[in-house]
Regions:
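Bacterial N-terminal signal peptides
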Residues: 4-17
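Extended, histidine- and acidic-residue-enriched regions that form the cofactor-binding/catalytic faces
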Residues: 20-112, 116-132, 140-295
Length: 295
């Protein structure tokens, strides 16, 4: 009887330990929710692949929250990481948004700080085992900043790779839009539809028609291909582009699924990528002695 009881206790203990082991227990994809020990296991499970969802704080018409880009990009990134495991960095909103400084609630960090903070962040992520970092962009104002940042990684040797994944919307099977896609650029039909899925509690659809999101085209005299920083303000001074009132949950579900699937595919591709770091290292070595590079 005693031996039988002891055996049962031993089996129970082993079962508990096995159930709590990293391989069997559910590891959160949220960096900030992991314990120090679990974080180590999470990095191993993620194959050193981490996501940095990148948002911003800016006006989104009269009907969406200031952090809409951050909320949406984190929604899709977290859902993707749960399908293809990756560690997701906490809220990050230190990007380019000078064009919205005239609107309340906008937080626009200086250009030097934006790049310095992003570099420090990816360096620290890498020091903690994230050797493959996918910056998931959720803000159109970062479309030039982030590729430049990725390119600048060639300035100094690093033991990790930065990848940049852009905003992914639209595609085959997309529901028909009610508004003009050409001006559906900010807090309009598409973005508002996605927000109805990510954070429906923060969408005030009834307020959308109270402000114009029309293109004012105040620089139409300039030729195509000629760039000036005031272009966005010249077209959309209300910092609203499109028709948010046209949003639907049907379109939002399509947008969310498309973006999540795109991130999942990117995570899988990055996990399998062995060439980028090898080529980086080759480039760093050759850069030390450019005169020795075969011509």
């Amino acid at each position: 009887m005693y031996k039988s009881l002891l055996l049962s206790i031993n089996v129970l203990c082993v079962s508990i330990v096995w159930a709590q082991s990293p391989a069997q227990s559910k590891l959160s994809v949220h960096w900030e929710e992991l314990t120090a020990a679990d974080f180590r296991d999470a990095i191993a499970r993620a194959q050193a692949t981490c996501l940095l969802p990148f948002g911003i704080l800016e006006k989104h018409g009269l009907h969406l929250p200031l952090g809409n880009d951050l909320l949406n990009v984190r929604y899709v990134a977290l859902n993707a990481a749960q399908q293809e495991y990756a560690v997701v960095f906490p809220e990050y909103y230190f990007g380019q948004i000078f064009e919205a400084k005239h609107q309340p609630g906008t937080v626009a960090y200086s250009r030097g700080l934006e790049l310095e903070l992003l570099q420090e962040t990816t360096d620290e992520m890498a020091r903690n085992g994230c050797k493959k970092i996918i910056i998931v962009n959720g803000h159109g104002g970062n479309n030039s900043l982030l590729p430049y940042f990725a390119q600048s990684q060639l300035e100094t040797p690093r033991d990790y790779v930065v990848y940049v994944l852009g905003i992914m919307r639209g595609g085959p099977g997309e529901p028909k839009h009610k508004s003009d896609p050409a001006t559906d650029m900010h807090a309009g039909e598409s973005e508002t539809s996605l927000s109805m899925i990510a954070r429906p509690d923060l969408v005030h659809l009834d307020r959308a028609p109270q402000e114009s999101g029309a293109d004012q085209a105040r620089l139409k005299g300039l030729p195509e291909g000629l760039y000036t920083g005031i272009w966005w303000y010249a077209r959309f001074p209300n910092h609203y582009a499109g028709e948010g009132a046209a949003a639907t949950r049907e379109l939002g579900e399509f947008e969310a699924k498309t973006w999540v699937n795109g991130i999942v595919q990117a995570i899988r591709a990055v996990k399998a990528d062995k060439e980028s770091l090898r080529l980086q290292n080759e480039f760093y070595e050759r850069s030390k002695h450019p005169l020795e590079t075969p011509q």
